[in-house]
C-alpha cells in the first residue's frame, strides 16, 4: 500500500490548494484529507453574522439552529425560517446557525465557487455558511460527500480521524447523526483563510474556539438508490405500458400458488430488456437527473415572454443575461453539436454557445459576440423558461 501524501500544505494566491488542481485530484480527491494553510489569505467572506441571520429569516432559505446542551449531553435542532427574537433568546455559547444554498441567494457568495470549478460543475452542490459562538458545533459526524471547509472570521478547532477502522455508528439518542464514538488522529485550529478538504466518510468534529464563520463548499454525490429510483421512473415514462410480463411458454404448474424459477427468469429478462440503455439514452437520463438533483427551488418563467428580435435589441443596448441561480446547468456532445440541460430540461445547441453558457454566469453583447440564429433562439427560449434572467436597466 502506497504511503499517504502530506496532510498539511501551504497555499498561495496562485495555488490555493497548495498544488495544481491536477495533482490535488490525483493525490487527494476522494482519497485523503488535506489541510491547506492560508489557501485564501485574509479571507473573511462576503457575509457578516447579521447578514447570515437575516438570510435565516427568509422563507426560501433552508436554515437550522443547532444548540448543544452540555448538562444533559443533548442536541436541540431547530429548523427555520426564524424570527429575530429567536436569536435574542439564545445562550452565550454552544450554538451554531447554518444556512444552505447561500451561493443561490447571494451573488457574491456564488463567486467563491470559481476556484473550485476544476471539479465538474454538476458535481458542485452548494455553499453552506455557518456562524457559531464559542463551543458551537454540530458534533462528530461523517459526510457522504466531498467538502472544502474554508475558515472565515474567528477560529475553529477541527479534529479528524484517518483510522480506516474507525466506527461509523451513530448515537441513537441524538437529533443529529452524531458518531457514538470518535477518536481523532489529527487536531488543528484553523485561522481565517485556512481550508480543510475532507473526502466522503471521514469522521470529523469542528468546535468554534471563538465566534466564527465557516464556509462549506459541498459536492454532490447521489446515492445509487437515488439513481435507481430516478432511472426507473424515467424508464417507465419512456417505455410506456405496452412492454409487459408475458409467458407464452407457460406450462401447467405443479403448485398453482408458487412463483417458480421460470417466472423469475421471465421477470429477469424483462427487466434486463427495460434497463438495456444505449449510451445516448443513458446520457440523457443521467443529465436530467443530475441537473435537478437536490434542487431546493424551481425556476419560474418570466411574466412577459420575448422573441429573438427583442432579445437581440436588448443586448444591443447593453442588457445583461444572468443565469438563474436555481438552474443547474450541464451539456453533452452530440457529434459536432451539443445538448444543453437546465434543471432537468434540454435544448439542442451548438458547442460554441454551450461553452459560453458554461464559462459565463453573465452574458452581454461583448461576451456573446456574433450569434448564429439558432444560438439567439436558444437564449430566447432559455429566458422564456426562466433559466436566463434579463437585466435591461
Model-derived segments and spans:
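Short, solvent-exposed secondary-structure boundary motifs
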Residues: 14-18, 77-80, 194-196, 310-326
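C-terminal amphipathic alpha-helical segment
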Residues: 232-311
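Long, charge-rich, low-complexity alpha-helical segments
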Residues: 2-9, 31, 344-393
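Active-site region of the double-stranded beta-helix
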Residues: 2-27, 41-194, 202, 207-244, ...
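Acidic, low-complexity/disordered tracts enriched in E/D and polar residues
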Residues: 275-359, 380, 391-393
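Sequence-level motif detector for i,i+2 pairs with an aromatic at +2
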Residues: 30-31, 94, 124-126, 335-337, ...
